[in-house]
Amino acid sequence: MPIAKVHRIATASPDDVSGLAAAIATGAIAPAGILAIFGKTEGNGCVNDFSRGFAVQSLQMLLRGHMGAAADEVCLVMSGGTEGGMSPHFLVFERAEGNAPEAAPALAIGRAHTPDLPFEALGRMGQVRMVAQAVRRAMAAAGITDPEDVHFVQVKCPLLTAMRVKEAEARGATTATSDTLKSMGLSRGASALGIALALGEVAEDALSDAVICADYGLWSARASCSSGIELLGHEIVVLGMSEGWSGPLAIAHGVMADAIDVTPVKAALSALGAEAGEATIVLAKAEPSRSGRIRGKRHTMLDDSDISPTRHARAFVAGALAGVVGHTEIYVSGGGEHQGPDGGGPVAVIAARTMG
């Protein structure tokens, strides 16, 4: 029976794969079992954040040395931006085989890749449907049949550049936007609605091109979408609970109502029978509230011309969550279009369950 393992590895720079290399060398991680790697890299998290691609390239070089062509199947999801005290790190998701003493259900991992997304489909229903189909494939790969057993879906999605817009126009097509920064939000939003569609959180007849990044009453409680320049398709990882997996690890999720709402994290830990600590894995989304207020108090994250609002939000939310779990290697991704309510966002906790 498969056993899910999650390894959190600190990095000294985006290309620092020495920790992963050492874990492979000592046998702590079997490269053949690596399904996905999430990373927080120290870039700006915007269009011109090449720290993500730098990390992906470095990881691919290492993995190909151990896995050959199979390395291309590993989902590499790099999220740029380690603002505030957030510490750069990798999360390595591994599938092992064995007979764990812990009874099922347990943490299950599934992954899927999509073909390259036509540039004119980005931020439109074509992207929504492409992501929804891939989420369903990833669920099947994880052995999850009930969408209620899915607790977190991570999607790495593409963005538009000036050259990509021109390429579409040369074919007689039009893109949803020519603003490259805005394209990041549209891509995240369409991907999130694709997740919501796959999980039954939003009905397909409620969706159209017009609602993407417009009707924020439509959102997923389990979506985390990160856009980047380093890919043209989507890489999708589903994390949930399955009777077909065993082992000590389990996952639970909640939705933060705002940037300082840490109650869902505590509730998730309680649901797992786990305590906060160094071993706790936290995955979260962050987005400044569009109202410009947090519990009635004014914030200035939307008014800073020097620093992107998503960068402010990542730092703020990571600090709040670090205070709960007691460490700063937290995966907080910025840009929460259709990912949780305005100013809040999905959060998931992975921890070892208390035996007995």
From Swiss-Prot:
Keywords: Hydrolase, Magnesium, Metal-binding. Inhibited by barbituric acid. Its EC number is 3.5.2.15. GO terms for biological process: atrazine catabolic process. Mg(2+) binds at residues 287, 336, 339-341, 344. Pfam families: Amido_AtzD_TrzD. It catalyses: cyanurate + H2O = 1-carboxybiuret + H(+). GO terms for molecular function: cyanuric acid amidohydrolase activity; metal ion binding. InterPro entries: AtzD/Barbiturase (IPR014086), AtzD/Barbiturase_RUA (IPR043008), AtzD/Barbiturase_RUB (IPR043006), AtzD/Barbiturase_RUC (IPR043007). The record marks 310 as: Important for substrate specificity. Pathway: Xenobiotic degradation; atrazine degradation; biuret from cyanurate: step 1/1. Changing residue 226 to A: Reduces catalytic activity 1e9-fold. The active site is at 156, 226 (nucleophile). Transmembrane segments: none annotated. Residues 106-243 are annotated as: RU B. Residues 1-99 are annotated as: RU A. Substrate binds at residues 52, 79-80, 188, 226-227, 314, 333-334. Changing residue 285 to A: Reduces catalytic activity 1e4-fold. Residues 249-356 are annotated as: RU C. Homotetramer. Responsible for the hydrolysis of cyanuric acid, an intermediate formed during catabolism of s-triazine based compounds in herbicides such as atrazine and polymers such as melamine. Catalyzes the hydrolytic opening of the s-triazine ring of cyanuric acid (2,4,6-trihydroxy-s-triazine) to yield carbon dioxide and carboxybiuret, which spontaneously decarboxylates to biuret. The monomer structure is formed from three repeating units (RUs) that share the same structure as one another. The monomer, the active site and substrate all possess threefold rotational symmetry, to the extent that the active site possesses three potential Ser-Lys catalytic dyads. It is possible that any or all of the three active-site serines may act as nucleophile (albeit only one can do so per catalytic cycle). Mutant, bioinformatic and structural data propose one specific dyad being involved in catalysis. Belongs to the cyclic amide hydrolase (CyAH) family. This is Cyanuric acid amidohydrolase.
